């Protein structure tokens, strides 16, 4: 099992959503310079999002029809942004773990979905559309909130109702995901690769013809239960996801055994019940080198409870476990005092580090306090 080469993981995600860091010339270099100055040591740059790559990919050109995301192509021309990020980061002592953010999720309208509709898994109603929701949205849903919050929620639902899911049992889907990850591992001097909560299968899916056929072959002709939460049906699909993960990791490690395979999931009960992502089994089987657990909570007691879950305790006995903290989003700003409190809580519990989602909300202008104040607090936290 590969392991991070330093004591405390201090990471941040670089994304293409509500952020200019990948698109504006000089932005990624400036971001990495500032991160190094504030004692960060890891970046997770997005390389797979909405059915496109964020590096020039021969495989994407062949299988999707575009070598990389069109807007980055338009804004940066021939610049390989992943290469730039790796060179700048390594020069300043930061590790780089490219982040395959969207995993198996793609927009219904994407080139990939249009070109290969048979690669998509379906609900029992025969729809390829799905609804992605993480724990943060699930908790916010319990409180309807004010008019603005309800408007944001309906806008979000309109957007995500257009999502589809690649079938993890489809050989060509496996070939695509594996091929993209191998392309990055073989062509760039990366320190690792990262998957997150999108690398699973929504529990309402799995009723496409291919999955049904495989299930019938293994169940003497019997069709999958109509109850999406049937225990055996959930275990069967989760086991198929685990088999895919096993093959993926084995292939990556054959190419480079030192590559860190990082996973940034939601809590285990949520991941398994909603996305059939049985990461506790993945940890037990040695498939993950690093766990970066998403704990997006405003309430400190609730935050603390997540750190003490049984799956987290199991993982800590086997691999480095750090905590993914929300530093804010466009619609959900987070005060620096809350961030500080959460970092101190994580440290008190003896975890292996913290990482923040995402770059623009660390100390940019999407924040409740001045960038100067936020940078000063991060300096105090990380200069020790």
Model segments located where?
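Active-site-adjacent "subsite" loops/lids of carbohydrate-active enzymes
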Residues: 6-15, 19-22, 26, 98, ...
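Acidic-and-aromatic substrate-binding clefts and catalytic sites of carbohydrate-active enzymes
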Residues: 19-26, 46-53, 75-79, 201, ...
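Short, acidic/polar
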Residues: 20-37, 173-184, 271-285, 334-347
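Aromatic- and glycine-enriched glycan-recognition loops and surfaces
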Residues: 20-38, 65-92, 175-179, 239-246
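Catalytic domains of carbohydrate-active enzymes, especially glycoside hydrolases
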Residues: 26-53, 187-192, 287-291, 348-354
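Aromatic-lined carbohydrate-binding/catalytic grooves of carbohydrate-active enzymes
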Residues: 40-77
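Glycoside hydrolase catalytic-domain groove-lining segments
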Residues: 204-206, 210-332
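Substrate-binding cleft of secreted/luminal carbohydrate-active enzymes
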Residues: 288-303, 310, 317-384
């Amino acid at each position: 099992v590969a392991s991070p080469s330093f004591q405390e993981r201090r990471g941040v995600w670089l994304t293409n959503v509500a952020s200019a860091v990948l698109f504006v010339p000089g932005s990624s270099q400036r971001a990495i310079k500032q991160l190094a100055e504030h004692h960060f040591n890891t970046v997770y740059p997005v390389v797979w999002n909405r059915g496109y790559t964020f590096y020039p990919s021969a495989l994407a050109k062949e299988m999707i029809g575009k070598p990389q995301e069109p807007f980055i192509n338009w804004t940066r021309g021939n610049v390989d942004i992943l290469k730039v990020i790796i060179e700048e980061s390594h020069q300043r002592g930061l590790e780089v773990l490219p982040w395959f953010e969207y995993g198996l999720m793609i927009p219904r309208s994407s080139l990939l979905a249009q070109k290969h509709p048979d690669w998509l898994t379906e609900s029992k109603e025969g729809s390829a559309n799905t609804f992605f929701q993480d724990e943060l949205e699930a908790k916010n849903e319990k409180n309807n909130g004010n008019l603005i919050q309800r408007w944001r929620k309906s806008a979000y639902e309109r957007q995500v109702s257009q999502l589809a899911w690649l079938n993890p049992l489809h050989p060509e889907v496996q070939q695509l995901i594996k091929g993209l990850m191998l392309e990055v591992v073989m062509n760039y001097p990366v320190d690792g690769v990262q998957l997150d909560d999108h690398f699973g299968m929504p529990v309402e899916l799995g009723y496409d013809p291919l999955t049904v056929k495989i299930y019938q072959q293994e169940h003497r002709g019997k069709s999958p239960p109509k109850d999406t939460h049937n225990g055996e049906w959930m275990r069967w699909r989760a086991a198929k996801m685990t088999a895919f993960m096993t093959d993926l990791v084995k292939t990556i490690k054959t190419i480079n055994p030192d590559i860190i395979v990082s996973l940034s999931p939601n809590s285990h009960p949520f991941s398994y019940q909603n996305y059939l992502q049985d990461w506790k089994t993945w940890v037990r089987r040695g498939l993950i080198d690093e766990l970066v657990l998403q704990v997006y909570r405003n309430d400190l007691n609730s935050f603390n409870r997540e750190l003490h879950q049984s799956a987290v305790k199991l993982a800590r006995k086997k691999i480095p476990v750090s905590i993914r903290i929300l530093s804010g989003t466009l619609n959900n700003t987070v005060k620096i005092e809350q961030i500080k409190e959460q970092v101190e809580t994580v440290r008190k519990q003896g975890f292996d580090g913290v990482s923040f989602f995402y770059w623009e909300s660390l100390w940019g202008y999407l924040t409740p306090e001045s960038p100067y104040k936020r940078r000063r607090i991060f300096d105090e936290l990380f200069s020790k």
